[in-house]
Amino acid sequence: MVGFAEVIRALGGDSDSESPLHGVSSSTSPKPQTVSFLRKWTTDSARLLEENPQTLFIVPPEGADATRENAVAVANPRLAYALVVRDFLQGDLPATLSPMAFISESAELADTVSVGHFAVIEDGVVVGPGSVIDHHVVLRTGVRVGSNTRIGSHTSVGGRGFGFEMDDDGRPIRIGHMGGVLIGDHVEIGSHCAIAQGTIEPTRISDHVKIDDCVFIAHNVFVGENSFIIAGAEISGSATIGRDVWISPEAAVINKASIGDGALVGIGAVVIKDVEDHTIVAGVPAKPIGHRPPR
């Protein structure tokens, strides 16, 4: 059983508390035997700790002198809280393959992969250790998923992209897509997303990318490491998204555009030309409005 003392020591503090830890609570409604965090130290913070001795608080450095057996001061309380929840409260769930999923005999799934109900994993798909394929996910032939990656319910990866060429009679002829999709390690893809496979070369989602629900990523797109793409965004074909980029909700990026490292695209922006590194753009069409400092 996890206790306050174990968590406090893991965060660099010292405690002999015997209180057990069973869950989480907010700082506005603290509950016994839970962990909470304070973003800022205010004049009321010390009283909050004193009145709730059975709640474990993670506080900013300004609260170090007032910490008690139920508190620990760290540089980044929100990050420390996230690590405590991950490492002490959530834990690793056992890998399970739903009997109601379709998994091709030629698919390669590591032993620690989990697959939910009614998921479809087609021929030749590769999924790395620790990854979770949620209910109703479809992974088409040509998809490779790295380790410790999670794909949310009702997401389709590797479907054919939207590309046509007109014949001599002016009729649209679909261009076959055979490039597949490469998804890196520690990627999170939300529910109801669609990621199209590349035409010839793969669509690529790099390590540690975080994609929210209801995002569309077209064929041949490249998304760099540590980038965030938020709900409702649309990335058109052959666009390049750099490292540490933030694409806000409902933003759209035109085909073949390049978004530089560290850039931020504002809510509902329509990007019709390249965006330089660490530039903030917003509006329709998107225009530079500021500078985003490197992290």
PLM segments and residue spans:
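Terminal amphipathic alpha-helical/low-complexity segments used for targeting or macromolecular assembly
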Residues: 1-100, 148, 154-155, 159-174, ...
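Structural signal for interior beta-strand "rungs" in well-ordered beta-sheet cores
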Residues: 37, 96-282, 286-289
